[in-house]
Each structure stands twice: as C-alpha cells, then as structure tokens.
C-alpha cells in the first residue's frame, strides 16, 4: 500500500523506505491521538510489518498498546520485536491437495507452538476464494466461501493451530458470522473473533464512515461471539495520499485518522449497548 501512496514504480530506494516508515508513524500518531481522546488503550492494538515498523512498535509498547507484526520470512523476523501478537493474512482452500495443506498447517503449528511457549498469540486474518466447482457444489459463491472458512477453521484446530484472534471479512456472508464465531470458540477455546473492515481504497471518506464501515461495525457489535474490528488501511489511505502530495498538513492527517477511529469505536460501543444479545 505504501508503494501505491508514494507512487513508487519499482524497487523502493532508501529514501522511499524512510518516507514509508514516516507514514507509518503518522498512522500511529492518529491511533495515539484517538487513545488520548478516549478510546481505551486496553481495547486497541497496532499491526505493522517488522521491516519498517519497529519504531512504531516500540512507541506502542511504551504506551501499553497491544502490538502485532507479520512474520515476513520467518519467526526469527518478529522474535526480537517482543510483540504481543504474530499477525498472518492467509487465503486457504481446505479442499486443496493434502500435501499442500499439511505443509502450511505444520508451519502454522510451529508458530502456534512457539506462541504457547513464549506467550505470543497468533492473529489469523483468514479468507477463502472458492473455485468454480466449489461454487457449483454450494450453489453460490458466498455460501461456498462461508462453508470453506468454517472448514478451514476446523482443519486448523484439528492440526493444533491455536489462534488467539480470528478475523474475517463478513461482506456477503453476514448470516454465517455467528456460526464462524461459534466454531472459533468450540470446546471452550478462548479465541477472540474480529470482523475486517476499512479495506476499500476507492471510497473517499475522511471523518465520515462509509456505508460498509457502518454496516460491519454494527454487525460486529450485535453478533454474539464477535469481540471487535480489524480496521484496514482504508481508514487512513486517502489521508496519507493527501499528506504525501502536500494537500494537507501532517497534523491534519493525524487528526483525521484519529477521528475516523473514534467514530468507529463510538458506533461499536453504541450499537453493542443497544443490542439485546449483550
């Protein structure tokens, strides 16, 4: 995403990398401002890559904000960062060849096992893209996707992969979210479930939430077994583009990001308080 924001055509230069690292600090400042204005720090965490986000992680830990980093080329790339979570974005086909699945599940089991020993939990943002045959079998693409996600979680659990947090994009499969959440908690597992939102770069909303963000935030708040949101780069993409092009000042970008996060938090809390489920 940062290559897109900075319009980097090829391999990033050292100057490009420093610019990208600075933009990550802007996003963190937005989160920090939101926390200072009332979002409970115990309810938020920041997920960055270990390549450019070390300074952000250190500042987050100093504020007692939860931290997560992607493993990159292996577990060693995040061990030295002392993060609270190892974050993995994964598209998985539970019907793919057995040897392909076994290899991946073993890798995840290693991460999960390391987590048990080192008190670092996994965040798995999971998706599944159905094949034409799978769509045919289930009748439509959304029903196929929901069932593949459910089957994927079952396979991970059977393989001993213990994720502290599961995250899913609920668009199109809203009616299946309670089932996915129930599977994540099966047999008394203490996993938490998040719904992914703000992954749309096309809709330009600074302080206003777009329709998808409102819908998913309310869905998360009103669904038993769902604990919160995994907020994607759509919440700050346009602010960073405008900042990098000189259209807005740094402080304006930070405040806009903070307001966006505050609006989502307030909508979640208001919707949860009004829900008969809780």
Identify the residue ranges that each predicted region occupies.
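Conserved, mostly hydrophobic/aromatic
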Residues: 125, 166, 232
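Short beta-strand/loop segments at the ligand-binding rim of alpha/beta enzyme cores
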Residues: 63-69, 118-122, 183-207
């Amino acid at each position: 995403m940062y290559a897109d924001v900075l319009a980097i055509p090829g391999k990033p230069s050292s100057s490009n990398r420093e610019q990208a690292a600075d933009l990550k600090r802007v996003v963190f400042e937005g989160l920090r401002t939101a926390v200072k204005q009332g979002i409970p720090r115990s309810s938020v965490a920041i997920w960055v890559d270990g390549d450019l986000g070390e300074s952000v992680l250190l500042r987050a830990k100093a504020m007692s904000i939860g931290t997560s980093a992607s493993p990159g080329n292996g577990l060693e790339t995040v061990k030295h960062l002392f993060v609270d979570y190892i974050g993995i974005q994964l598209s998985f086909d539970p019907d793919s060849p057995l040897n392909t699945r076994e290899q991946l599940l073993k890798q995840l089991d290693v991460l999960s096992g390391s987590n048990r020993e080192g008190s670092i939990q996994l965040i798995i943002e999971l998706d599944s893209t159905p094949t034409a045959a799978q769509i045919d079998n289930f009748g439509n693409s959304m029903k196929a996707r929901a069932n593949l996600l459910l089957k994927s979680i079952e396979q991970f659990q059977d393989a001993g992969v213990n994720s502290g947090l599961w995250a899913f994009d609920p668009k199109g499969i809203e009616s299946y979210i309670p089932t996915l959440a129930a599977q994540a908690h099966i047999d008394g597992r203490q996993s938490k479930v998040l719904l992914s939102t703000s992954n749309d770069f096309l809709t330009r909303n600074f302080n206003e939430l777009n329709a998808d963000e409102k819908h998913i935030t309310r869905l998360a708040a009103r669904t038993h077994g769902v604990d919160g949101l995994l907020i994607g780069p759509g919440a700050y993409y346009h602010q960073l583009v405008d900042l990098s092009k000189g259209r807005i000042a740094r402080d304006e970008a930070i405040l806009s990001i903070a307001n966006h996060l505050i609006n989502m938090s307030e909508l979640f809390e208001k919707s949860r308080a009004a829900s008969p489920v809780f």
